[in-house]
């Protein structure tokens, strides 16, 4: 089939990508955050992340210089199997994390390192991320937020 191009034309091992944006909030508020750095499917016998880690690549996220730690993973198995149900590895399968947005601009920074594109823990090492601010119940996007890497309100 046809390959869909990624951001990097020739991605290299042992590199780190950074992604950032600013989010304008019209008011100080607590919102939900869905974040993930590896999307899991049970067609692969991938292992869930280790406790306290987002993934096996050491990805990290900060909002306004405060690191956002991952949730407690419900799947804790250490043996690869297609027969073990997914837990809350994928962001839409868990309640969003509660995070604080200040009134005005909020900096969101992601660190996305890749050592190797092969791993004993996951078959398809994905250089990807999802970062979405949602209502605390996870039902919809937060109204009134403006996303801009240049801090423009347009």
Where are these regions (language model features)?
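Beta-strand elements of well-folded, non-transmembrane domains
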Residues: 21-27, 37-41, 114-116, 135
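Extended carbohydrate-recognition surfaces in non-catalytic/accessory domains of CAZymes
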Residues: 1-27
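Activation corresponds to long, low-complexity, non-globular regions
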Residues: 140-154
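Short beta-strand-to-coil "C-cap" segments at the C-terminal boundary of structured domains/repeats
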Residues: 112, 131-138
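Extracellular and analogous surface-interaction loops
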Residues: 19-32, 97-103
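Beta-strand-rich ligand-recognition modules
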Residues: 47, 52-129
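A short beta-strand element within beta-rich, extracytoplasmic domains
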Residues: 27-51
